[in-house]
Amino acid sequence: MKIAIYSTKSYDRKYIELINAKYNFDLEFFDFMLNESTVRLAEHCEVVCIFVNDNGSRKVLEKLAALGVKIVALRCAGFNNVDLKAAQELGIQVVRVPAYSPEAVAEHTIGLMMTLNRRIHRAYQRTREANFSLEGLIGFNMYGRTVGVIGTGKIGIAVMRILKGFGMNILAYDPFKNPVVEELGGQYVELDELYAKSHVITLHCPATPENYHLLNCEAFAKMKDGVMIVNTSRGSLIDTQAAIDALKQRKIGALGMDVYENERDLFFEDKSNEVIQDDIFRRLSSCHNVLLTGHQAFLTEEALTNIADVTLSNIYKLKSGKVCENIVLPS
């Protein structure tokens, strides 16, 4: 069976080929994204494997179906880039990797928090220039502060476990309550209360129509002055222009982002020799109290191994007629 694998980097290929030793699928790797222009390269493939920024729109799916593609395998947890209704109508099965390594994303989240709090990124640049001044590097003790965790799935819970060790007070919000939150000493509250009481707010929820621009100008207005916000989930959860305005007004004291709502044309590529055309992103990246990483929170050896393993296992189960627990259906 032939599989077209889009948006692959060297690290993807390494782990996928390693796991494929037990399946012997015929793999064809492409280092560019799936879109209306590149869909033709999936000809003669039964399966297309894609990542977070690939185009799974109705138009693309229609072209895939015409080529005979029967499975779209996402090697990520999110599936907002795939038109699930269209896939179902076209007879294309969609599978994903729901929990490849919650700890990987959680640990990166904490890394962003600590770097922003203790100004480590600024201190690093200073010491490289023999500037050992401590002016402007004052942080705060995490111990005793209040963190608001929005989204209490596996990643949110992994973040809570770490922050409990810091001695933080944990507030949580999620429409679907997880009993582990109380076991960790956390407390569920409504969003407005979480906004008002949290010194740090961290996002761990999916990109859905209901969550689009969850953090907007109205939400920022309800928060403490100087709040720290970290987003390692989906870029569309934050209204970026509203965040810039809140940074200028010092409502947001620090912002850590591993995702960006218009990241498709930026992330996963080397743009160092180009002029970034996204003015909003350029303004955001110019702020000294903003720390951006390029959607790397998942990037650990363990996560890459799990992603490859579950992705190929999903495909094998579907082609073998076995039950696959990771099928994604339209709501």
Curated annotation (Swiss-Prot):
Keywords: NAD, Oxidoreductase. Its EC number is 1.1.1.-. The active site is at residues 234, 263, 295. It is an enzyme of class 1 (oxidoreductase). InterPro entries: D-isomer_2_OHA_DH_cat_dom (IPR006139), D-isomer_DH_CS (IPR029753), D-isomer_DH_CS1 (IPR029752), D-isomer_DH_NAD-bd (IPR006140), NAD(P)-bd_dom_sf (IPR036291). It comes from the Bacteria. NAD(+) binds at residues 154-155, 232-234, 258, 295-298. GO terms for molecular function: D-lactate dehydrogenase activity; NAD binding. Belongs to the D-isomer specific 2-hydroxyacid dehydrogenase family. This is 2-hydroxyacid dehydrogenase homolog.
